[in-house]
């Protein structure tokens, strides 16, 4: 399990995802620096969760599970969440692709 960002929001997301899914692999990365937000903001995240809990579920079902797990944060602190929810049997150690830099938002 790895965590690429260690701010308080990232740590909370990691803790909640780990408790809910007991993942074989977990990455939580704050991508707010790619967006037009104040320095140090933790608003935009991507997560990669590899878990047996996702076996036999469609992508939309896996995403709903993650969104439900993080519902409080999505309603308050987190503005955007990119999800890679992968069944353990389908994971081959691949890393997430880099997200593109934000091209919109206030002041762009």
UniProtKB/Swiss-Prot annotation:
TM annotation in the entry: none
Chain intervals for the UniProt region annotation (Disordered): 89-108
Domain of life: Eukaryota
A GO cellular component entry from the record: mitochondrion
Protein name per Swiss-Prot or TrEMBL: Putative bolA-like protein K11H12.1
PANTHER family: BOLA TRANSCRIPTION REGULATOR, BOLA-LIKE PROTEIN 1
SUPFAM superfamilies per the UniProt record, alphabetical: BolA-like
InterPro entries named among the record's database cross-references: BolA, BolA-like_sf, BolA/IbaG_stress_morph_reg
Membership in a protein family: Belongs to the BolA/IbaG family.
Lineage: Eukaryota, Metazoa, Ecdysozoa, Nematoda, Chromadorea
Pfam families: BolA
Organism of this sequence: Caenorhabditis elegans
